[in-house]
């Protein structure tokens, strides 16, 4: 089925910027954080002090204007101040498989947006295989790191950035 924003409009493919607003945790928005000795922040986090947060775009190479739950997607920050804007999943200590940003993207991304309760969740499909893993939140250093946490997804609503 079609992925909808907070106004009930279809989320558009490779167009518009969207806030991911947490359903459960009240306030907080997407941000980037440095981990270890990274030269620039590359870890995607939900930061309670950062609202409404960075905006993302959903992209599929399919020639279709809207995003559906069955589509494999690239997710990227827009507008981005750095070359690294595309989401990927990589090992990160101690969170495990964490969402990071990279400057390279495959044509078809490894994520899907799927309905969950009051909102949506992001599901990571390694190698775009059959089995998906929920992207959840791992709490550390007053931030919530987006990481694989199967069965405990981060549930959010999708608000178009122009609907202030």
Curated annotation (Swiss-Prot):
The keyword Nucleotide-binding does not apply. InterPro entries: Kunitz_inhibitor_STI-like_sf, Prot_inh_Kunz-lg. Gene3D superfamilies: 2.80.10.50. GO terms for molecular function: serine-type endopeptidase inhibitor activity. It comes from the Eukaryota. Keywords: Protease inhibitor, Serine protease inhibitor. Pfam families: Kunitz_legume. The record marks 63-64 as: Reactive bond for elastase. The keyword Metal-binding does not apply. Belongs to the leguminous Kunitz-type inhibitor family. Inhibitor of trypsin and human plasma kallikrein with a Ki of 2.9 nM and 14.0 nM, respectively. Does not inhibit chymotrypsin, porcine pancreatic elastas, human neutrophil elastase, coagulation factor Xa, human thrombin, porcine pancreatic kallikrein or plasmin. This is Kunitz-type trypsin inhibitor BrTI. It comes from Bauhinia rufa.
């Amino acid at each position: 089925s079609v992925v909808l924003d907070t106004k009930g409009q279809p989320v558009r493919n490779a167009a518009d910027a969207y806030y991911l607003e947490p359903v459960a945790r009240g306030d907080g928005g997407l941000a980037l954080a440095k981990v270890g000795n990274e030269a620039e922040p590359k870890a995607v986090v939900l930061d309670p002090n950062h609202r409404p947060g960075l905006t993302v775009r959903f992209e599929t190479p399919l020639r279709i204007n809207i995003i559906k739950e069955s589509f494999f997607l690239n997710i990227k920050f827009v507008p981005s101040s750095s070359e690294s804007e595309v989401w990927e999943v990589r090992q990160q200590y101690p969170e495990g498989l964490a969402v990071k940003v990279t400057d390279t993207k495959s044509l078809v991304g490894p994520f899907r947006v799927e309905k969950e309760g009051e909102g949506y969740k992001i599901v990571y499909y390694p190698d775009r295989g059959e089995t998906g893993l929920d992207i959840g939140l791992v709490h550390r250093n007053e931030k919530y790191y987006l990481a694989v946490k199967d069965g405990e997804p981060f549930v959010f609503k999708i608000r178009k950035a122009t609907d202030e």
